[in-house]
Amino acid sequence: MGVQSNISDTLSGKTILIVGGTSGIGLAAATQAKSFGAKVIVVGSDAGRAKEAAEQHGLSGWRAADVTKRTAIESALADIDHVDHLVLLAGSFVVGKVLEADVDHLRRAFEERVWAAIYTLRSLGDRLAADGSVTFISGALSDRPNAYGTAVLAAASAAMEALARGLALELAPRRVNTLSPGPIDTPLLGKALGDNRDAFVEGLRATLPLHRLGSAEEAGAAVLFLMANGWMNGATLNLDGGSRLV
């Protein structure tokens, strides 16, 4: 049986909830899952963008919520009867040095990644299928921090991976895994770097073994692999084109 056939057999007819699914990796995973016959609901912070993403790509539904607010998540998910697979990747690019940046700004790294995940899981409760899965999206900063104001973001990314491992035990027999992507060319990169994006990407490419950034579609395919592989549990999958080696 081929890989695509296995994914199709596993995901067809399933309900997939993607928190942070209106662009980039989340939207790529959503559209690919839909192509395999899944019913996909995306959650975003902006109602207009969430609605547009769902309608443009023929997804089953959308919700808008501030993921850092427990009551907002509860309200957004209240009418969803059942979820087979949950993907958690909401989070802005929170940058700022510990001794210089506003503390409330830095706190968002954990609120958007760790606490948002906890609020979502508690809101769903037993509506998350017993034979389902949860997939976190962290990032290479979790084990490759730098000196450019990413210490708190790196800590939040590492916390997501640790949380996922613990949840693989707490939520069993549900499977819980993390995808840890390296440099991926997504809208978030442009938002974070602004006018410096092109120069940064060009310099980064020269340092990478494959001389390019990964695509949202490649990362989305890895998300589907983690959903569909029934023996993958408590794992962190590094998808970085070898960038951790240099």
Residue positions per predicted region:
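Substrate-binding pocket helix/loop in short-chain dehydrogenase/reductase
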Residues: 97-98, 105-107, 200, 204
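C-terminal substrate-recognition "lid" of short-chain dehydrogenase/reductases
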Residues: 212-239, 244
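A glycine/serine/threonine-rich, flexible loop-to-helix segment
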Residues: 184-207
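Conserved glycine-rich cofactor-binding loop
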Residues: 22-23
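Conserved NAD(P)H cofactor-binding loop of Rossmann-fold oxidoreductase domains
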Residues: 87-96, 241-242
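Catalytic loop of short-chain dehydrogenase/reductase
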Residues: 109-110, 118-119, 131-172, 183
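Rossmann-fold cofactor-recognition segment
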Residues: 56-71
